[in-house]
Amino acid sequence: DYYASRGLGDVYKRQEEELPRLRTSKYTQSRTGTCFQDILRLLKQGEKVLFAGTPCQTAGLHLFLRKEYDNLLTVDIVCHGVPSPVIFTDYISYLEHRYKSPVKNYNFRDKKWSWYHFNTKAEFKNRKAVYLGTWEEDTFMRGFLRDYFLRESCYTCKYSKHERYADITLSDFWGYDATDGGFPNDDKGISMCMCNTVSG
């Protein structure tokens, strides 16, 4: 969802048809707002809750809850770091000025041509979508992946280690090599899933 990708708030959904809003990579900081309080309320009501976030957000949730809940399942990611939402907002403003149209959606990793050499894509209200280039060519993605504007705490992250707070850890399987008899890399994307707990 474009608004989630702009850091305007975390989204929780209860219907299966609403889940597509949560798909795709979003490389900007999200605001948790009342997310933790909402989760605690749902857990106490006996609802099953799946929380997905960065490792530090997952750790923060567990610290907030102060106890384990059997009806909570947590998922984190192998995190590169979280870029400044101000930088992203400024970048969107630049695109809107350059293309003379408001941005209605932004895809950080469009895989139309390639998973590995993915493109960024901006969709505008008054014109066709614009492919902004591969991550090496797009200004925002290049700065993000070269660590130019991550949050200060990300440079000394204490959660980027093998021990995890989450039940499940997900990531892209970069560096996968099929030469040892594995399935072929078709450049459509390979995911890694680590189960860290019995629940996971």
Please provide the spans of the model-predicted regions:
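Short, charged, surface-exposed secondary-structure boundary motifs
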Residues: V82-Y91, D180
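Short, surface-exposed basic-aromatic patches at helix termini and helix-loop junctions that form
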Residues: H62-L73, I92-H97
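Single conserved hydrophobic/aromatic residue that forms the stacking wall/gate
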Residues: D1-Y12
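Generic beta-sheet signal
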Residues: E47-G53, L72
